């Protein structure tokens, strides 16, 4: 598969597709990293060796109504330096932690949720309601979490009328940066 297509469709610019599978209404792309790690990120030693691998599946953006599974061979690396204990798997730039979906898929789900319910979105994409809810909760937590109060030295408080009558709102602002705290 063309690596330019992998990059533009799913953001896989450091990976290559080794083969494709078609099972029912699902496209499975088998990918692996283009280049292997050569230098230990912990000690800088140049003898980093492969130490096994694991296969992980990620839900990718659908194509033409077909579900896309990105099946990645995640390589583990171990440092040969006796003083170093580095033994980790390679980084996965298109997904976070143990998530089973890509960043672009999560962005797509959030876009659909602007006009659809959780149930409708899960039915359309053929994924569980729990996965859609997890994506939505992560999005809300990231964008609407309370701001950090670290480094705030002085605040300003303003109360204003939202509508004429007895509806008042209070706003708390960091006076140095102008960021709204509450």
Tell where the protein language model's regions lie, with residue ranges.
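Secondary-structure boundary/capping micro-motif
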Residues: 19, 78, 112, 176-177
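Mobile genetic element proteins and their domesticated derivatives, centered on retroelements
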Residues: 29, 40-43, 79, 109, ...
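Residue-level detection of the helix-turn-helix DNA-binding "recognition helix"
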Residues: 45, 126, 137, 141
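Short, Lys/Arg-enriched anionic-surface-contact patches
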Residues: 85-105
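Short, amphipathic alpha-helical "recognition" segments used to contact nucleic acids or chromatin
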Residues: 101-116
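Short, basic interhelical loop/turn and adjoining N-cap
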Residues: 113, 119-134
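RNase H-like nuclease fold core
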Residues: 133-182
